[in-house]
């Protein structure tokens, strides 16, 4: 009898050749279709942000404090305290955030899923989540995994003795791994850093948007660049990686010192004796990975990074011990029992050593990683650390604020914060926006805009440019705040500064006359343009509008932190800043995903924008109509017309010719033609090209447009 499975493989439940295997160059529309009802086990009307308001916060915090000192035999706590473990669970949840695209971070509970649950840098965070499970089980729907993991780290620091800065609830769990996050191209864990740097000697040449030096790490290699100790080189990598998650040198030094004030590294054993990571573990392991298969593997015999030892004399207490240890001793390179490079003091009194995690009568050698040594060797970090040493209270305050920033950076603006411990202060990295007025007449504003002489293209383009900066990844950007009129946005090439200045001059005058914020006037301008274009095409529509946007000021805006929000391409306006290795249609998909659009929404917006005269610089690519300024489905009708042919005519330029006469009718970009060439996008385009769907096209365009304009309105229910 054949050894093959007797069951017919009717369902692709595990492996099989995928479309991506057959056609690796195809675009991945799956990134637009994530986190829907089919993967979410919660009831359709479940609203976590309302449910968490019912939480008994004090009871939860009390239970977490008890957990910190409730050592479990199956995974005993070091020195009887889990504070180091839960600080690490929270840190490694939040620490995957990167400023470049806002992706990663602790806002979704993604540490529960691959690849993060099985990253080499996340060894044994699975044990932390299992220790949290009884608490999650008890409080159920009132606390998300995302909130619980981050809160556990904050409570850990409080138990250790730190006065924390605050905490906000509001992180909503996802139910499958994100498909849109690019973690790197490497095919092996901890592949050499050279694979993601143009020049590993120049940290700023790391591939964007990455913010970790190797595949599977949160930040840097604790042993040194590519595992070779050199504190100054490591300092340069530390500076770059932390900058890529929006931390300055002082915040970086504080986080390094404070992060290593509690807990320890684990490397007292052989790494090769560990079982597979959670995602590869056999079913009997029940999602737990890295278990020691040849020894005890817990307590003092635990293996995580391979480095072995604590940084301070009192690893469960918040104090200045890290500074005392690092700056009051000379250090030499040693190998841990697991074979990892670590720094150990050349000469240290026994009473200054930390005790064994299980037996307080035994003293153990303290350690420093290469990243710790970087704080001493690098002159900038050294100066900051000495400032902290001279003022311990300032250090504690700086760390507490940096920890709050680390764990809340991807939660979005302060309007999204929930709970009794939300700090009163407005912090500049939260992109604060003042409340806007609602005491004005919307129709009066619209009438003034309509009589201003602005074209449909000018009105719609300005509203779009203001709103398109929104990123659902970290809830930054968007039309609220009208930051399009501030640096750096007002000079971005993608915003056509000359055209923008002309429109803003009109809108600022209307704002002053009516009491509406400039932000509201900008969005209303888009509404006026769309309603005018729809009427010209025979459709009487009203674009929904929400009053109350505010106008941010330069003082409220960290211009440098907004630089990563600059669009390098905008397929919706048929524009690229320059040629890139990445295809234009892939950049369109990325933009659409960050804006929270679905495939059909992206499609209908492209078709509508093309006929409204919104192309950047007035280019004619994709304007498949002789009725520009009317909201028609002509783009789709002519794109899908087999009476045409499509021929390359230069770099990212194509000609649409009459099939019989060969006369050029229109020109197009790759972004235009992908809606006819990609089978999925063509299926959407055909819907909007149908004779009976012109009204549907208009209604769907208005709905998608409104979604974009309101994406950042967290200030309203």
Swiss-Prot record:
Cofactor note: Binds 1 heme b (iron(II)-protoporphyrin IX) group per dimer.
A Pfam short name: peroxidase
Cystine crosslinks: none
InterPro entries for this protein: Catalase_peroxidase, Haem_peroxidase, Haem_peroxidase_sf, Peroxidases_AS
Acyltransferase is among the record's keywords: no
GO cellular component terms, A-Z: cytosol
SUPFAM superfamilies for the chain: Heme-dependent peroxidases (SSF48113)
Catalytic activity line of the entry: H2O2 + AH2 = A + 2 H2O; 2 H2O2 = O2 + 2 H2O
Record-annotated active site: 92
Cross-link Tryptophyl-tyrosyl-methioninium (Trp-Tyr) (with M-245): residue positions: 91-219
EC class: oxidoreductase
Binding locations of heme b: 260
EC assignment: 1.11.1.21
Residues carrying the site annotation Transition state stabilizer: 88
PTM description: Formation of the three residue Trp-Tyr-Met cross-link is important for the catalase, but not the peroxidase activity of the enzyme.
Role summary: Bifunctional enzyme with both catalase and broad-spectrum peroxidase activity.
Description of how the protein assembles with itself and partners: Homodimer or homotetramer.
Name of the protein in its database record: Catalase-peroxidase
Organism: Chromohalobacter salexigens (strain ATCC BAA-138 / DSM 3043 / CIP 106854 / NCIMB 13768 / 1H11)
Gene from which the chain derives: katG
